[in-house]
Amino acid sequence: STNEKLAKKQRKILGPLGRLLLKVFRWEIKGKIPDLEKMILIGIPHTAMRDAWYALLAVWALDLKVNFFGAAWVFTRLPSLFTISKNLDRLGIPWPFWWLQKYLMLKLGGIPVYRVNSRGLIRGAVEEFKVIDNYILVIAPEGGVEAVDQFRSGFYYLAKGLNIPYVP
């Protein structure tokens, strides 16, 4: 079935590639995404960096057009098993192709979140997304890749401010 309201993107190469790679990794997409013009899609659990990889493959496989919040360092640095910096925006390992990584992350719909100074993020996001007609905003409510006992509440206040549903 076709979803007429859902934010879609025609992908001639990445769509089939996403479907193929999900099959290779023995992942299966089950259920349906509601046919809504605007929604916040909750990405849980997000307790490892590979979660983002599988989410990206699913987005490609379903030909979805999404935006997502990501820690600022993810846009310019490589993941590291060890914490190198105490500054939450400078985690990971610097590398010479940071500019290409940032370009690709932004093209994929990424919105960098500077965690050291994230005050006003929800208010700013409400203002930005109010003027957009059709979108899926993906949020991982854990706020990082660490296992947590309780979700951060930003997704709720964002959905409330935009008067749109959040979908688990």
Question: What are these language model-derived features?
Answer:
Residues 1-28:
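N-terminal membrane-anchoring alpha-helices
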Residues 7, 23-168:
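Soluble catalytic domains of membrane acyltransferases
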